[in-house]
Amino acid sequence: MQGGRVVLGLLCCLVAGVGSYTPWDISWAARGDPSAWSWGAEAHSRAVAGSHPVAVQCQEAQLVVTVHRDLFGTGRLINAADLTLGPAACKHSSLNAAHNTVTFAAGLHECGSVVQVTPDTLIYRTLINYDPSPASNPVIIRTNPAVIPIECHYPRRENVSSNAIRPTWSPFNSALSAEERLVFSLRLMSDDWSTERPFTGFQLGDILNIQAEVSTENHVPLRLFVDSCVAALSPDGDSSPHYAIIDFNGCLVDGRVDDTSSAFITPRPREDVLRFRIDVFRFAGDNRNLIYITCHLKVTPADQGPDPQNKACSFNKARNTWVPVEGSRDVCNCCETGNCEPPALSRRLNPMERWQSRRFRRDAGKEVAADVVIGPVLLSADPGAVGQQEEGGDGAAVMVPSVGTGLVCVAVAVALAAVGVAVGIARKGCTRTSAAV
């Protein structure tokens, strides 16, 4: 495999009422053409016929991932110490020397996993990292790094024992009904904003289209703002290195840089939706080729006008000025000075102090806010390593890799024990990252 990081995708689901089931397995192998990778029940490892390099079990409180050390189907076993789970780089739980497998077992919230909330589903997203150690001669390596995204899907209304999941909710403000629900979400969208898109296959020079939303069961009129966004190499926005994309209560500061086109999209499709685009980037000096973006989303009543603390401002390079999505241009004046806090908080804070002070802040009942993480967004090391999505049989989706790239895409048909359901990677709704308040 040449010139890039391998990206594989796994998806695992639990269906309401299913207490346990045999985990689904996926096999893959190279068949002549080094770019012609395939997944499915008929694939065979060149080392061990019928072996499954990666198997996932989505259990009630944890996930269990088993990785065969012949990860690439070449007959060459990788070093178990080179495999880790999640952004926190958790080590394996056990080794099976007889079967040459490495097993990771971790709680659903452990090892830096990201949880997503959709109206019907809880989605836990993590990844397996393969970072090969140098060969005996430290100036060379013989295999490429690999990132294997993993998702576990659970019904939000019921758990696997058929007992209702009862999350704790907070009302929008004291005037709203206690039955109301606020669900904040970030979605990665296609170029025309019509559908969600996978998190893989981005290259430097591409654009990330991000859609922020808030929904309530009773549809109380709300206006959504993206207060701040920080990119990092993990879901922890406080980690280092980090990069501020949106700051100062809604100023898209990345668009102020000369070589970017980052901006909010005007007009909004709805008051409770806000879209913005950013130019793809990576962190210099880091070979992981991935980023997480943590955004602080908040809402105000729809009839409350924008102000310096509640705004969405982009920098217009042609006019050399900041412009708002709505409201008077005066609300954006503070974007240039960086002093957008109300008088009581007007002291100049560094970006991380501002970030920490805003987490889940409620301002006298006028706003409800939450931090939402989107990622990992995976970058292709090689130009042209973007797959094309096609529909496959039995509800599966097929990601067809471009010829000559190191990107491995998948076709998945998942069989759940006693349940006649098939699900696939990159289906609509599987790339949404949300937070419920």
From Swiss-Prot:
InterPro entries: ZP-C, ZP-C_dom, ZP-N, ZP_chr, ZP_dom, ZP_dom_CS. The keyword Kinase does not apply. GO terms for biological process: binding of sperm to zona pellucida; egg coat formation; positive regulation of acrosome reaction; response to progesterone; response to testosterone. Changing N159Q: Loss of N-glycosylation. It is found in: Cell membrane. One of its GO terms (cellular component) is plasma membrane. Changing C251A: Abolishes secretion of processed zona pellucida sperm-binding protein 3. Residues 1-20 form the signal peptide. Residues 368-380 are annotated as: Extracellular hydrophobic patch. The ZP domain is involved in the polymerization of the ZP proteins to form the zona pellucida. Homodimer. Forms higher oligomers, once its C-terminus has been proteolytically removed. Forms heterooligomers with other zona pellucida glycoproteins. This is Zona pellucida sperm-binding protein 3. It comes from Gallus gallus. The lineage of its organism: Eukaryota, Metazoa, Chordata, Craniata, Vertebrata.
